[in-house]
A protein has these predicted regions:
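Beta-propeller folds
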Residues: 1-178
Length: 178
């Protein structure tokens, strides 16, 4: 007995000219950029239904691959500390949390601190906690982070929309205020 498979969807072309710096480009699929347009939603639902129907037989394999990758991923981890202007800077991740945490620790000589993943570090200063910044947002990406030469200000970039346009923020590391 064969099941009826959905037809392969084809996005209709709707030529939409756009002029930038005197050059006009016509994008026949620009209408798909609007996530609120019912036509976009309907098309994506059709794409998803088609893909699901064509790959349903792979569900077990998908789950096995996911579990293998997850099993090989060390969720609680940390980067190698880097010494800069009297501080050790490093990033760490924690199991069950999606985003990294950028930290620093006052340097006591040239020997890196003994930091163990998943263990609290005395004197650690959290510069940016991606998990806290992402809270309440559907999307989050942390861009660059850099500390001023005197170690008192942090410049970091965040993106909450996924459009790759980051907002530059500043944090006073003496007070913790943005």
């Amino acid at each position: 007995m064969s099941e009826t498979q959905p037809a392969k969807p084809a996005a209709p072309r709707r030529d939409q000219p756009r002029t930038h710096h005197g050059d006009t480009v016509t994008d026949p699929y620009a209408w798909l950029k609007d996530p609120e347009d019912p036509a976009t939603v309907d098309y994506l639902k059709a794409e998803n239904a088609y893909t699901e129907s064509r790959t349903a037989h792979l569900a077990g394999l998908r789950k096995a691959i996911f579990n293998e990758i997850k099993g090989r991923t060390q969720e609680t981890d940390l980067s190698v500390p880097v010494r800069k202007r009297g501080w050790w800077y490093y990033g760490r991740t924690e199991e069950g949390k999606q985003y990294g945490i950028q930290c620093r620790l006052k340097a006591d000589g040239d020997t890196p601190p003994e930091i163990e993943a998943g263990t609290a570090v005395d004197g650690e200063e959290i510069l940016v906690d991606g998990n806290a910044l992402a809270e309440g947002h559907d999307f989050f990406s942390l861009g660059t982070c850099d500390v001023s030469p005197d170690g008192n200000l942090l410049a970091y970039a965040v993106n909450y929309s996924g459009d790759e346009r980051f907002t530059l923020r500043f944090k006073d590391l003496r007070t913790g205020e943005d």
